[in-house]
């Protein structure tokens, strides 16, 4: 049982991990009345997960894993593995959650461009990291994530696949507990395309 845990700090403005090369952006427009109004409008109107997280979800589901997606950590629900997408804009919040998970003897892997170029604080917090495109690692069934203790702290140098070889993204799992939105395009659910 695997949880894709996409954590964010509490903020009055929108934070997205899927922009700026997946390092993320924070839309803090200032302290004036119009700025605060715009911040609230954007925060309530646009929200979606990072595409690499959705693709990893699809790879894991295709291989038969029980995968869940959440933006909230519930330690009462037990998972064999916690996978967190990394970002520069949520770095401190991610580290806090990693330390909490490791303290509770949970297995943690961090994915994404930010951890690829800035791994040390994640390693120091007790997580294992994937350097590079995480969907490429998870696509290969030879990579046994269930044998977590046998994985190196830094997972890298794995085979790359063409996009046509990858499985479909795991949007159905994402939609179980979370609805991505882009209200400027309508009130229904939205799938982002970068």
Please identify what each model-predicted range represents:
Residues 1-194:
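Acidic, low-complexity intrinsically disordered segments
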């Amino acid at each position: 049982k695997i949880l894709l845990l996409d954590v964010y700090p509490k903020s009055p403005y929108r934070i997205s991990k899927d922009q700026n090369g997946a390092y993320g952006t924070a839309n803090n427009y200032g302290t004036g009345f119009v700025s605060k109004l715009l911040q609230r409008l954007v925060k309530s109107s646009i929200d979606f997960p990072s595409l690499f997280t959705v693709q990893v979800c699809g790879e894991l589901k295709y291989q038969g894993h029980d995968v869940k997606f959440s933006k909230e950590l519930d330690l009462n629900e037990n998972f064999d593995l916690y996978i967190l997408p990394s970002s520069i804009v949520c770095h401190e919040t991610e580290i806090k959650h990693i330390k909490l998970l490791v303290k509770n003897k949970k297995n943690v892997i961090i994915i994404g461009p930010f951890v690829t170029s800035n791994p040390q604080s994640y390693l120091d917090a007790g997580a294992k990291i994937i350097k590079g495109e995480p969907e490429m690692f998870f696509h290969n069934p030879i990579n046994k994530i269930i044998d977590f203790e046998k994985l190196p702290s830094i997972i890298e140098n794995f085979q790359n696949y063409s996009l046509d070889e990858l499985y479909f993204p795991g949007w159905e799992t994402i939609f179980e507990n979370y609805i991505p939105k882009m209200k400027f395009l309508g009130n229904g659910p939205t799938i982002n395309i970068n």
